């Protein structure tokens, strides 16, 4: 094979579709816009949810609920994720972040009881579920609310 014989892989380079270049091109005359109407004109920009002047669905339905601006969002960690640490390790949010188990701390870390804990650990977090608390203490570990 020589350099002048190189060809791109089949289907890797798509030919640009040139519209309005004669009827035999398949996209002449109306250029793929159909017949007359708002969407056939230039400069058309219908916003999402526009229903042609009919009251849109989001306005027909009633408002419901609210967003609590004081709500706290905790980063969730399950027990089986803590098995990566050695026995006797003190697990804090900083240690969890360094280990790549959590990305951001948000309002703190909450430990949940999903999975099985196999190590004896000292876990420091903002909140614990009852099942997580029981599992950690059952393995001889301890918890501390920070």
From Swiss-Prot:
Keywords: Ribonucleoprotein, Ribosomal protein, RNA-binding, rRNA-binding. InterPro entries: Ribosomal_uL15, Ribosomal_uL15/eL18, Ribosomal_uL15/eL18_sf, Ribosomal_uL15_bac-type, Ribosomal_uL15_CS. It comes from the Bacteria. Residues 23-35 have a biased composition (Gly residues). Residues 1-57 are annotated as: Disordered. GO terms for molecular function: rRNA binding; structural constituent of ribosome. One of its GO terms (cellular component) is cytosolic large ribosomal subunit. Pfam families: Ribosomal_L27A. PROSITE patterns: RIBOSOMAL_L15. Disulfide bonds: none annotated. One of its GO terms (biological process) is translation. Residues 1-13 have a biased composition (Basic and acidic residues). Transmembrane segments: none annotated. Belongs to the universal ribosomal protein uL15 family. Binds to the 23S rRNA. Part of the 50S ribosomal subunit. This is Large ribosomal subunit protein uL15.
């Amino acid at each position: 094979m020589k350099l002048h014989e190189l060809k791109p892989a089949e289907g890797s380079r798509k030919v640009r579709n040139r519209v309005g270049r004669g009827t035999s091109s398949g996209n002449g005359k109306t250029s793929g816009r159909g017949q007359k109407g708002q969407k056939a004109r230039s400069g058309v920009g219908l916003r999402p949810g526009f229903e042609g002047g009919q009251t849109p669905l989001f306005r027909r339905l009633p408002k419901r609920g609210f967003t609590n601006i004081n709500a706290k969002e905790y980063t969730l960690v399950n027990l089986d994720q803590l098995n990566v640490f050695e026995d006797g390790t003190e697990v804090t949010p900083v240690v969890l972040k360094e280990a790549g188990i959590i990305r951001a701390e948000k309002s703190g870390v909450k430990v949940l009881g999903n999975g099985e804990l196999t190590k004896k650990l000292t876990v420091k977090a903002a909140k614990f579920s009852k099942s997580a608390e029981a599992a950690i203490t059952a393995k001889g570990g301890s918890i501390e609310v920070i």
